[in-house]
């Protein structure tokens, strides 16, 4: 499992890299193993009620919804992809619903996961302070975990919720680059990990350090 590229990782399923989700049942047992159920393609861009998100007219974007389920807990996962073909942008979100009979505790619930192809990558991000926002830093992605985050209750100038992963020989005019940005104004966390096999993973979402959510049946 740890050698495979994943779209969204559960927990305690043999993938020892960064996970997107940490969920415990009423006994305190951790685990979530999602399997494919169905998918649909819809015109327009999905909406996130009560949350900031990108918007588009029906003809300007498409939405892919992939539905998955964990048989043990009854937890269902919807992966939402908003495709802006003309802008070369894909937006991501994840929706969790408890269809089981008992409450579940979420200790981590990321919005998206991105596994990159093999290769040597650099991480570009922007840090700052008062009157010195958006200071560029470029560093090699090593065999470890690098974190960009904020626990201020807002994204803040401390660390911008945005990063670029680029080939180490990439310049302003050539080379492969992947940009990841949180459309979110609260505390956030973006983790980058290069595994022992050379795969690079990005997990992006709400800050897990001060996050816990009791998900009741039907929610």
How would you label these PLM feature ranges?
Residues 3-202, 207-213:
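Polysaccharide-binding surfaces and accessory modules of carbohydrate-active proteins
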């Amino acid at each position: 499992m740890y050698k495979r590229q994943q779209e969204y990782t559960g927990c305690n399923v043999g993938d020892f890299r960064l996970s997107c989700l940490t969920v415990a049942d009423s006994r305190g047992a951790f685990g979530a193993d999602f399997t494919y159920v169905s998918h649909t393609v819809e015109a327009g861009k999905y909406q996130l009620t009560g949350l900031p998100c990108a918007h588009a007219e029906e003809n300007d974007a498409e939405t892919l919804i992939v539905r998955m389920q964990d048989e043990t807990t009854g937890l269902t996962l919807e992966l939402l992809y908003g495709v802006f073909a003309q802008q070369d942008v894909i937006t991501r979100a994840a929706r969790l619903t408890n269809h089981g009979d008992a409450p579940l505790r979420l200790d981590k619930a990321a919005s998206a996961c991105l596994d990159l192809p093999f290769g040597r990558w650099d991480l570009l991000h922007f840090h700052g302070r008062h009157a010195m926002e958006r200071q560029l830093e470029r560093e090699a992605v090593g065999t470890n975990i690098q974190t960009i985050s904020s626990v201020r209750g807002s994204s803040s100038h401390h660390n911008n919720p945005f990063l670029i992963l680029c080939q180490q020989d990439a310049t302003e005019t050539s080379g492969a680059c992947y940009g990841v940005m949180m459309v979110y104004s609260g505390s956030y966390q973006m983790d980058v990990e290069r595994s022992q096999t050379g795969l690079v993973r990005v997990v992006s979402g709400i800050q897990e350090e001060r996050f816990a959510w009791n998900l009741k049946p039907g929610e």
